[in-house]
From Swiss-Prot:
Homotetramer. Belongs to the argininosuccinate synthase family. Type 1 subfamily. GO terms for cellular component: cytoplasm. Pathway: Amino-acid biosynthesis; L-arginine biosynthesis; L-arginine from L-ornithine and carbamoyl phosphate: step 2/3. It is found in: Cytoplasm. This is Argininosuccinate synthase. Its main location: cytoplasm. PROSITE patterns: ARGININOSUCCIN_SYN_1, ARGININOSUCCIN_SYN_2. It catalyses: L-citrulline + L-aspartate + ATP = 2-(N(omega)-L-arginino)succinate + AMP + diphosphate + H(+). It comes from the Bacteria.
Length: 399
């Protein structure tokens, strides 16, 4: 009889490296490790694949999903100007549904009836993975050894040392890091103390904002129907736009975020994020919407932007509400075409120019100089009618 196969989402890090070895010892099941290349950089994917085999996986598969991630997951984040709690551009959250998709495909291809992840019981990712599996493949069983067997980082490190698992994490450098082309997330260690400032070794995607203080970088991002299509006039793919802006904005220290966020499980958590390209693209897209969207549409979309970010953060990528919101957002992007110019400097993004053939900005109506076509004589009656409800309420309250 063939051994049962477990399909594991493998990152190459501590928890999933330990999980391969532990699953083999405790269950006698075979592990197929699935590595998803989301443009995380760092180690070569072949090195990560070989580590999975060295840890005991019977097979290790690398899926190049960089373009798919950029087009299908990062782009919607831009279209929705998605910042959870008005700050976090969903660096990790948007990657989980794509990983789920490829794990389900691997389970079907390799005859696995169990999928596994290395998430803890305190984080959001357990929800994102398992709700995703329930949405795409409710027949699959789920194994979560880190959560279900209460592994701590100390226990995982000890297990790795005892079993000669090839992973370089020690108690002296206990950061938990998740990264992809959209950004980088760092947590645990001394960062769990809210008063401790992050030190330079925490950062990787961004330089010290003071290094290039004398050489600010001006960049123009072009959009067609909300989609980034050019940088400084040169055509780019979505992946190319992210990568180019990661380099340029990262060199200016742009995209560093020190956030205390409300996790889905009910606790607050401190995270350090680096998302230079993401923050530039979201800033530019939102600015172009200010120019091209009618006032009421813009107001309402800002509400749906926030709700979309919350749904994705909370692991509801496949929810009917998110799908419906995206249909609405697609309709809003018809006129979001044009260019936004920004200066990247000292860790900040400063918009200093916008232009669009679809602009609702009318110079002749807006100017205070000669040539003003705004009929100011109409304002008196408008103000009277507009303020009438407040006037009536105030008169009543003074009785």
């Amino acid at each position: 009889m063939m051994p049962e196969r477990i399909i594991l989402a493998y990152s190459g890090g501590l928890d999933t490296s330990v999980a391969i070895n532990w699953i083999g010892k405790e269950t006698s099941h075979e592990v197929v490790a699935v590595v998803i290349d989301l443009g995380q950089g760092g180690e070569d994917m072949e090195v990560v694949r070989q580590r999975a085999l060295d840890c005991g996986a019977v097979e290790a598969i690398v899926v190049d999903a960089r373009d798919e991630f950029a087009e299908g997951y990062c782009l919607p984040t831009v279209l929705n100007n998605a910042l959870y709690m008005d700050r976090y551009p969903l660096v990790s959250a948007i990657s989980r549904p794509l990983i789920v998709k490829h794990l389900v495909a691997a389970a079907r291809a390799h005859g696995g009836s169990i999928v596994a992840h290395g998430c803890t019981g305190k984080g959001n990712d357990q929800v994102r993975f398992e709700v995703g599996f329930a949405s795409l493949a409710p027949d699959l069983e789920i194994l979560a050894p880190v959560r279900d067997y209460a592994w701590t980082r100390e226990k995982a490190i000890a297990f790795a040392e005892e079993n000669a698992i090839p992973i370089n994490v020690t108690k002296r450098s206990p950061f938990s890091i998740d990264q992809n082309v959209w950004g980088r997330a760092v947590e645990t260690g001394f960062l769990e103390h809210l008063w401790h400032a992050p030190t330079k070794e925490v950062y990787s995607y961004t330089d010290d904002p003071t290094i290039n203080w004398n050489t600010p970088d001006e960049v123009i991002v072009g959009f067609e129907h909300g989609v980034p299509v050019s940088i400084d006039g040169s055509p780019v793919s979505m992946l190319g736009a992210i990568e180019a802006l990661n380099r340029r904005a990262g060199a200016q220290g742009v995209g560093r975020l020190d956030v205390v966020e409300d996790r889905l499980v009910g606790i607050k958590s401190r995270e350090i994020y680096e998302a230079p390209g993401a923050m530039v693209l979201i800033t530019a897209h939102a600015e172009l919407e200010h120019v091209t969207l009618e006032r009421e549409l813009g107001r309402f979309k800002r509400q749906t932007d926030r709700r979309w970010a919350e749904l994705v953060y909370d692991g509801l990528w496949y929810s009917p509400l998110k799908t419906a919101l995206e249909s609405f957002v697609a309709a809003t992007q018809q006129h979001v075409t044009g260019e936004v110019r920004m200066v990247l400097h000292g860790g900040h993004i400063a918009v200093n120019g916008r232009r669009s053939a679809e602009s609702l900005y009318d110079f002749n109506l807006a100017t205070y100089d000669e040539g003003d076509t705004f009929d100011q004589s109409a304002a008196r009656g408008f103000v009277y009618v507009y303020g009438l409800p407040s006037k009536l309420a105030a008169r009543r309250d003074l009785r």
